[in-house]
Amino acid sequence: MTFSVLLLAFLLRILSTSHLAQAQSVAPPAKLSVHWEELTAADFREGIHRSQGTCLLPFGILEKHGPHLPLGTDLLDVRYAALHAAEQEYAIVFPEYYFGQIAEARHEPGTVAYSREMQLALLQETTDEMARNGCKKVIIVNGHGGNESLLPYFAQTQLDKPHDYVVYVFDRRSPESGGPAKKTTIDMHAGESETSKMMIARPDTVHIDRAATESGADQHRQNLPEDVYTGIWWYARFPNHYSGDGSAATQELGKFQMDWWIDAVAKAIRAVKADDVSLKLQNEFYEKSKHPLDTQP
């Protein structure tokens, strides 16, 4: 009798252990923060594995945004979009980065404008260090219009020498159409769209009552053809570093545009994770560039 009881207890223990193991094996993975700076070293390792080595570098700036938005608007907006996108499609998001191109706003208080040498060197060091830590797919998510030439140029210069990682640039911040009707036609900086998005990302920093205290109108102080570029073009048109009318902003427009942005970044993350061609082509290119005379059509 005693033997039967012991045998039954033994079998029940094995069965319960088996069920526990099965439950643990099908349990969803533990939630990991998408914030680089919030992860422990061990969790960072797991995050790299879970993200398939895909990391985001949200790129902002410190500059005046009209009379009503904070200096860090671009950084606050792009990080809001990137962090929410990474929650949808897991990726590790690098901490605050604002070391970009903003020479055109050096006359305004609070602007931090680094030299072109520093911008490129620091960005290269940053992506190199991200890759050394396992981020073999670095997506730079741009939040600042003044970086629109800098970032593609930086990505192109990655062909200068071999790298074991790929730099991708994502530079769409608003949909071309759809959503609530806009009230303004000029809307390039701190205007209706950007103010609306900040009403979603950081409404506590928006001073909508100040939006009409300065002019965001185009001053048309140059008379050059559209295809003739000069660095002073922005200051010539918008000397107040304000383009548009932020007082027209609404939360409805902000939610539509921010939701679109988050979804677009999430789609970009998925596409980059699935990309198994770019690094192979980079390596092929590096090898061929050593012996250009051997390259055949």
Regions found by a protein language model. Give the residues of each.
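Short intrinsically disordered, low-complexity coil segments enriched in acidic
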Residues: M1-F3, E63
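Bacterial N-terminal signal peptides
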Residues: F3-S18
